[in-house]
Design a protein with these regions (language model features):
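A short alpha-helical cap/connector motif
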Residues: 1-116, 123-143, 147-160
Length: 160
């Protein structure tokens, strides 16, 4: 069975090239992206939080599944990496880019909860987990990426 997604966001090709030229290797794969789009589509007018924008591949997948009334907030510490996502995706009025440490952002955020929280960086996954879970609306979804075991056999206790 081939479970490769049949379609992808238009911006994805450019974002993958940008990731390659900047040696950014932590983007979500196509299967994860397809899941993100499906989860976003299941939340009409949903509020979506992405922790770890990276170059924007996950962001593009989320936007591809969201309806016009949905809103996405995406948080990234590395302004240079996030600039790639901003350049390609900021014309979409549904997305708000935040350049900040996701841990600090989680500590300071006092707005409404989110229907979908996608944690693709350390805060919200390995640190600040309880706070991230507190931001999931009742009936909402919390999803993490990149929890594969380390090749060194060590558990993921700190960023490398």
């Amino acid at each position: 069975m081939d479970d490769t997604p049949r379609s992808a966001p238009t911006a994805l090709a450019h974002l993958r090239v940008a990731a390659s030229t900047t040696d950014f290797t932590r983007s979500c794969d196509a299967r994860t992206g397809s899941l993100l789009a499906a989860l976003a589509a299941a939340r009409p007018a949903g509020r979506v939080l992405e922790l770890g924008t990276g170059v924007g591949e996950g962001t593009a997948w989320l936007l591809s599944g969201m309806d016009r009334a949905a809103r996405l907030t995406t948080v990234e510490l590395d302004a240079g990496v996030q600039a790639i996502a901003r350049e390609e995706l900021s014309a979409d009025p549904r997305v708000t880019f935040v350049t900040a440490d996701a841990g600090h952002w989680l500590e300071e955020y006092s707005g409404e909860p989110f229907d979908l929280v996608f944690a693709d960086t350390w805060p919200g996954k390995f640190t600040h987990l309880e706070r991230a879970l507190d931001l999931v609306a009742p009936g909402g979804t919390y999803l993490i990426d990149d929890l594969t075991p380390s090749r060194t056999g060590r558990s993921p206790t700190r960023p490398r």
